[in-house]
């Protein structure tokens, strides 16, 4: 009920501002985590003890893996498809256990999962996004309470439990999203005559963000001439294609929900009142007005186009998350932006006290093991997951190739992701800013 009511309200808000902005002269030329909770002292001790057993656990997993079972992982994240394919190949080479990884296309995971689960060889490993997803797939979720991946969680908060208290899912990645920005372009802008800020650090509210974006949009030709960029707009295109619209229909929509929950001191409700709907509308309006494209073409704009616009330095601001780091820094994509050029700031919507707001941090990625699979395949899947979080190969892949921040105690030292967005999230927390919880899953 909550999601349906919100969907109708926000869809109306989006359409209203898109049509209103179609003739707006501001549009550009037409041309993709930090652990918010601190570890308890007990968890810290457990982490220290875990360091001494990681290697042996990985060896035991490889030694005990049975050749009679197999693993079929239906992966949710297209960005990490190749890394999972590579990791599956390494595991099969070491153990002889077949591991198949199939990745659903952007925005199609639920329908793909339904289709695959109806087959005789269904996924043995899949994911749900949280309580809402669990409600749909609870009859397929094996109890992970005694599994290695559950035992290695740094906090019970990352275990997704059913009504009976069984662990039906385990979070495997903590993610953060906000407004990714190009430090180089923004810093260059700050040196211009009559720039509205002298440092990116001054952006700590919607009003300040809007003032900067409006000025960049109005002066993009001047910026290009002075610094040699090919800037097309302040923000990347806010595409409403299925590969992109989730950024606004769920992630952006989380902000008004978060502030309404915060005001009421609640964590869930059957239906929101829409207290911050106007705030949602104004940030959305800013996205589509100070953009690389006219509002009238947004329906066909894709996530890949937005990613490319940011990567090729055609835009300064790009709403997305930590998962996008790998794509933006992948040399094969030929992007101009580098890791050193990028930062992430909070999404400001004009809510009271937002100057103390951090980035949006949480998880909608929970591993679930299909309890309707054979016993051999269930055990093979549990062994594979144990190897992933304990072995050098698995941890290196998740931390570096995939760029994940994980909730597992085994990811320390060299296995902490070198992701600048995660570093920014940690810095906001260190500075006393409050992370925004995820309330849409």
List PLM regions with ranges.
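Extracytoplasmic "Venus flytrap"/periplasmic binding protein-like
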Residues: 90-156, 168-169, 184-198, 316-317, ...
């Amino acid at each position: 009920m909550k999601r349906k009511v919100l969907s109708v309200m926000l869809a109306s808000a989006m359409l209203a501002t898109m049509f209103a902005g179609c003739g707006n002269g501001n549009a550009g030329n037409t041309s993709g985590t930090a652990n918010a909770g601190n570890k308890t002292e007990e968890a810290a001790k457990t982490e220290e003890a875990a360091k001494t057993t990681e290697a042996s656990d990985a060896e035991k997993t490889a030694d005990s893996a049975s050749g009679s079972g197999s693993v079929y992982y239906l992966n949710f994240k297209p960005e990490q498809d190749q890394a999972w394919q590579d990791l599956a190949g390494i595991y099969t080479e070491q153990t002889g256990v077949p591991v198949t990884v199939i990745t659903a296309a952007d925005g199609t995971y639920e329908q793909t999962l339904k289709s695959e689960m109806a087959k005789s060889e269904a996924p043995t490993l899949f994911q749900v996004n949280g309580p809402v997803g669990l409600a749909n797939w609870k009859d397929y979720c094996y109890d992970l309470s005694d599994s290695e991946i559950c035992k290695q969680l740094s906090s019970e908060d990352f275990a997704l439990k059913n009504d009976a208290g069984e662990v039906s899912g385990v979070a495997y990645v903590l993610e953060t999203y906000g407004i990714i920005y190009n430090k180089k372009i923004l810093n260059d802008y700050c040196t211009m005559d009559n720039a509205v800020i002298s440092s990116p650090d001054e952006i700590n509210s919607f009003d300040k963000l809007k003032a900067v974006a409006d000025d960049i949009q109005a002066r993009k030709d001047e910026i290009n001439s002075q610094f040699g960029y090919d800037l097309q707009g302040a923000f990347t295109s806010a595409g409403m294609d299925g590969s992109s619209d989730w950024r606004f229909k769920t992630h952006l929509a989380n902000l008004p929900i978060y502030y309404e929950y915060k005001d009421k001191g609640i964590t869930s409700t059957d239906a929101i009142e829409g207290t911050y709907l106007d705030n949602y509308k104004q940030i959305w309006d800013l996205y589509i007005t100070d953009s690389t494209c006219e509002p009238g073409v947004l329906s066909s704009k894709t996530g890949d186009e937005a990613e490319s616009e940011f990567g090729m330095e055609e835009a300064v601001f790009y709403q997305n998350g930590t998962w996008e780091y790998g794509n933006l820094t992948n040399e094969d994509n030929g992007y101009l932006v580098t890791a050193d050029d990028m930062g992430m700031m909070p999404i400001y919507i004009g809510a009271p006290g937002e100057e103390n707001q951090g980035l949006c941090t949480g998880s909608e990625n929970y591993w679930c093991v299909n309890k309707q699979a054979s016993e051999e395949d269930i055990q093979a899947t549990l062994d594979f997951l144990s190897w992933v979080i304990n072995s050098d190969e698995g941890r290196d892949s998740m931390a570096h190739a995939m760029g994940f921040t994980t909730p597992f105690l085994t990811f320390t030292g060299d296995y902490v992701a070198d992701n600048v967005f995660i570093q920014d999230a940690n810095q906001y927390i260190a500075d006393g800013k409050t992370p925004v919880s995820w309330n849409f899953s």
